[in-house]
């Protein structure tokens, strides 16, 4: 992978420092520009945060060892559902910075046109806030903070 990134940076004139993160790589290859994160709607942040969190969970599960896909799916589904995300927020909320808490609140208070089938409205709103926070941290390029919060919220024994 590193060799192909080096080759890509040599042939396309890409900045090697920017290639060290997924977001930087996407920005360079697709000519994207960073936007002011405060301009994103909380539901847009939740949209990307949902995918980021799902990828983190799936990566952890796959890296723990090869097993049947249906087992991976069941375990991942239990960890990404609204009820679990809501419970995680109860654990990690005291850890949030003022800025992170503001993003979480905006996501939690956003009025979504949909609702999870198997969650209470309170759980769904807290989960939306959690996903908005994950999206915000991803777009801020703070993956280490995402991992820190996920680890604290889930705990290693649940995975």
Model regions: which residues?
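Double-stranded RNA-binding/processing signature
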Residues: 1-159
């Amino acid at each position: 992978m590193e060799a192909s990134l080096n080759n890509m940076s040599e042939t396309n004139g890409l900045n090697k420092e920017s290639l060290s993160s997924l977001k930087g790589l996407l920005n360079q290859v697709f000519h994207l520009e960073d936007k002011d994160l405060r301009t994103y709607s909380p539901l847009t942040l939740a949209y990307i945060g949902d995918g980021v969190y799902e990828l983190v969970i799936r990566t952890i599960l796959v890296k723990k060892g090869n097993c049947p896909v249906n087992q991976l799916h069941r375990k991942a589904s239990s960890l990404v559902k609204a009820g679990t995300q809501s419970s995680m927020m109860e654990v990690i909320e005291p850890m949030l910075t003022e800025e992170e808490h503001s993003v979480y609140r905006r996501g939690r208070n956003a009025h979504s046109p949909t609702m999870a089938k198997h969650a209470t409205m309170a759980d769904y709103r807290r989960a939306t806030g959690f996903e908005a926070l994950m999206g915000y941290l991803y777009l801020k390029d703070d993956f280490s903070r995402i991992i820190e919060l996920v680890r604290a919220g889930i705990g290693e024994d649940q995975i």
